[in-house]
Structure formats: structure tokens, C-alpha cells
Amino acid sequence: MKIAEITNKPVSISQTVDGGSLEGYVVDSDQPQLNNYLSSQGASTDVISSIQQRFKRIAIIRNMYVDEDRRGQGIGNDLVGNAIDSADRAGARAIVLVSDTQEDNAMNLTQWYEGFGFEQIGTAGGDPVMVLEL
């Protein structure tokens, strides 16, 4: 197998801890996973193209969950912090996610992600598409 073939395969940054989990992976931005994920969330082709043009290798956080009775204990902070470290080690230049504002949460998830340095660059199905440049 050639090195180029290895780098085209997604690298998992998924993790599960007691009380929560995060699902994500790192891919080259010209691979179909980025387009497929953002399209399925309702992102415009302009948003997708701008990400692909800015970053060659990108991490995608598809899903994060913290058990309701464990929220407020730092589990989400640890999951995102570990995902940022894993993405950086895997060569990602940025992390992209769609902040789920439709979910019933006691906190503003968009502001919470902004606390890590994520910035909104567009929307997908009415939810913010957020990017953290590494």
C-alpha cells in the first residue's frame, strides 16, 4: 500500500468515556466524507467549498453526547479537548462541526464551542457550521 493511499483513509478521533462519547474523524478535504457530512446537515455548497479551499486536511466532529445526569462535570470539555489534540496529531489543519441548536440543552452550545476557539462560518439546516483552525 502506498503512503498516499494511507492518508486518504479517515483517521478516527472518536472516544468513549464514562458518561459521554464523541464521534469524529480526520480526512483530506477533497475526500467525500466532508461533503457528505455537511450536505447531509443542510450546508450550502458555498460553505463546503470555502472549507475545502482553506484546509487540505480537516477533522469532523459528527456527534458528541454527555449523559444528562453527568452534564456540568467537565466531561464535554475533556471530550472536545482530547478531540482537538487527536486531530492535531493526525495532521488536521482545522476541525469542523455543526452546533445542534435544535436540541434541548440547558446551555448555549454555540457559545460553548466558541469558548474553545470555534468560529461560525455559515449554517447547515439552520444550525451554525463552526470551524476551529489548528
Regions found by a protein language model. Give the residues of each.
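Conserved acyl-donor/pantetheine-binding loop and adjacent beta-alpha core of acyl/acetyltransferases
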Residues: 16-60
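Short beta-strand micro-motifs in enzyme catalytic cores
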Residues: 11-13, 57-59, 128-130
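Conserved N-terminal entry element of GNAT/NAT acetyltransferase domains
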Residues: 1-19
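Conserved GNAT acetyl-CoA-binding A-motif
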Residues: 87-102
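Residue-level recognition of the GNAT/N-acetyltransferase active site
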Residues: 62, 67, 100
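Conserved acetyl-CoA-binding loop-helix of GNAT-fold acetyltransferases
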Residues: 66, 72-85
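Conserved short alpha-helix immediately C-terminal to the canonical SAM/SAH-binding motif I
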Residues: 79, 105, 109
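Conserved catalytic-core motifs of GNAT/GCN5-like acyltransferases
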Residues: 98-99, 110, 114-131
